Amino acid sequence: MAKLHDYYKDEVVQKLMSQFGYHSVMQVPRVEKITLNMGVGEA
């Protein structure tokens, strides 16, 4: 999970700032929770 957080912090935030014109890192939306759901077939 740390890898994904580092990628978001280092690369995605910079791209969002340039694309939407944010002036501060605090204006960029944050990822708060990621939920995965996987079915296992017949119960």
UniProtKB/Swiss-Prot annotation:
This is one of the proteins that bind and probably mediate the attachment of the 5S RNA into the large ribosomal subunit, where it forms part of the central protuberance. In the 70S ribosome it contacts protein S13 of the 30S subunit (bridge B1b), connecting the 2 subunits; this bridge is implicated in subunit movement. Contacts the P site tRNA; the 5S rRNA and some of its associated proteins might help stabilize positioning of ribosome-bound tRNAs. The keyword rRNA-binding applies. Keywords: Ribonucleoprotein, Ribosomal protein, RNA-binding, rRNA-binding, tRNA-binding. GO terms for cellular component: ribonucleoprotein complex; ribosome. Belongs to the universal ribosomal protein uL5 family. One of its GO terms (molecular function) is rRNA binding. It comes from the Bacteria. The lineage of its organism: Bacteria, Pseudomonadati, Pseudomonadota, Gammaproteobacteria, Enterobacterales. This is Large ribosomal subunit protein uL5. InterPro entries: Ribosomal_uL5_dom_sf. Part of the 50S ribosomal subunit; part of the 5S rRNA/L5/L18/L25 subcomplex. Contacts the 5S rRNA and the P site tRNA. Forms a bridge to the 30S subunit in the 70S ribosome.
